[in-house]
């Protein structure tokens, strides 16, 4: 698995822009805890979080069978749509916190993250998809283009 991660990151690392690194480094340098939450499985997202220096990761956890192999099933609450709110709530509770304590900025490119964008104090649409972009603009949320102009 380590070799697969290395090969994967050789392809991904060049797409991590300087602006994306700045968006991660700035709050970290200010002492904030960085939490990456993704609807993609942990196997894929863990090396990306590590490359960015992100403190914590919430992702889809894949169930493993008795031999350690992935079963193809999801373990626990999927971190997708409203499930992201549930999983972050669990993460906060494990630290003796709740949503009232969270001073959060959340970046997303997907309409599927609308529930989380509506939950946080500072929603940001980053490379938003065609359905998220007009909502973000209508609500006055910042819209970032991390990969240059989007069609």
Which residue stretches match the model-derived regions?
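C-terminal cap/substrate-recognition subdomain and adjoining C-terminal extension
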Residues: 2-6, 10-151
